[in-house]
Design a protein with these regions (language model features):
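Extracellular glycan-recognition regions
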Residues: 2-7
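Acyl-donor-binding surface of acyltransferase catalytic domains
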Residues: 9-134
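A mid-sequence, solvent-exposed acidic-amphipathic segment
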Residues: 134-161
Length: 161
């Protein structure tokens, strides 16, 4: 894969998760769409969203329960995209949702690799590729960040050190 393919793939998945078009992430204006459940969305997402904001730098795409469209629209149009994802700006969004009995909950940042920067690194551990039968006994609390017992049918490949 090259850098262009990586960002296109990420935008396509984000578009599926949010219920928008991949091109929405490169527009010059913010976009608001109604959040819906999509069977091709990431399996751990609880859809539809009340409010989910995503930016690849140009703008913000907001996938929302339309009851809260005005709150979100006012918020994302008040600040530059990068400032919508940091405090103290997020306190304003939190305050608006708190009036409806909700609070800002999860904040995540994902970083896409630059292919020209990737190099194989030495590893002092033996790596083992495992398949479902190999890791069926590893659904334990200490591995819950990697394996999910609630969706174990989706776990098909694992690399362990």
């Amino acid at each position: 894969m090259n850098n262009s393919q990586i960002i296109s793939t990420a935008m396509a998945q984000s578009a599926t998760d949010l219920g928008c078009a991949p091109e929405d992430f490169i527009k010059d204006k913010n976009i608001i769409v109604e959040s819906t459940a999509d069977p091709n969305a990431r399996k751990y997402l609880k859809l539809p969203f009340i409010c989910d904001l995503v930016s690849y730098g140009n703008n913000i795409v907001a996938s929302v329960d339309m009851k809260y469209k005005d709150i979100v629209e006012q918020y994302i149009n008040r600040f530059a995209p990068e400032h919508c994802f940091e405090t103290p700006s997020m306190h304003i969004l939190n305050d608006a949702f708190q009036a409806h009995g909700m609070r800002v909950c999860f904040m995540a940042e994902y970083f896409l690799p630059r292919m020209e920067s990737l190099q194989e690194q030495p590893c002092r551990y033996e790596l083992k590729v495992m398949y479902p039968n190999d890791f069926k006994d590893l659904y334990l609390p200490q591995w819950s960040n990697a394996l999910c017992i609630d969706r174990k049918d989706l776990d098909v490949l694992c690399v362990g050190a």
